[in-house]
Amino acid sequence: EYSSKTFISSKENIVRTHLFLILLIGFCYGQLFELNHDNDTRIYWVDYPDNATEPTPLVISMHGRNQSLLSHITYSQMSNFANPQNIAVVYPQGINSSGLLAWNTGVWWDNSEYDDVGYLNAIIDSVISNFAIDTNRIYACGMSNGGFMAYELACELSDRIVAFGSVAGNFMMNV
């Protein structure tokens, strides 16, 4: 039987678990960053190859709706492939829309006040200023709603991002 106290307690445990996992991942690889964009503080994770000796390609890898950067790092396994190839990966976090983390594109999005294209463009600028990135080899991909966002970036940031990929994300006609 659930009470409000049980719900709060379980919610606190979920938060503690996520914080523990973020710290654990931090000791393994990567770095968590905060970025203030449009008066919101948002986060993203960068996994930069340890042995890079020259500017590296950058992959922007976006989670699906109701996922997080942490869950995406875990299930995508992108860093396991990218790091040995001297490829940097950035995992941005979507914004909370109706209680779910999502990107402001696709059929479920109902709040146009967030500029995720601007946010992702600012992440690219930040990563370039903090790491040695080959600016001619920036890529974007995503799962589901993150794939929708990859298509959005293909239309909006094609001057910066050279290739795009989507897994289980449709190209939306309004893009």
Q: Where are these predicted regions, by residue range?
A:
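N-terminal secretory signal peptides that target proteins for export/translocation
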Residues: 1-15
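Sec-dependent N-terminal signal peptides
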Residues: 17-27
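Serine-hydrolase catalytic machinery in alpha/beta-hydrolase-like enzymes
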Residues: 35-48, 54-139, 152, 156
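Primarily recognizes the serine-hydrolase "nucleophile elbow" in alpha/beta-hydrolase
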Residues: 136-175
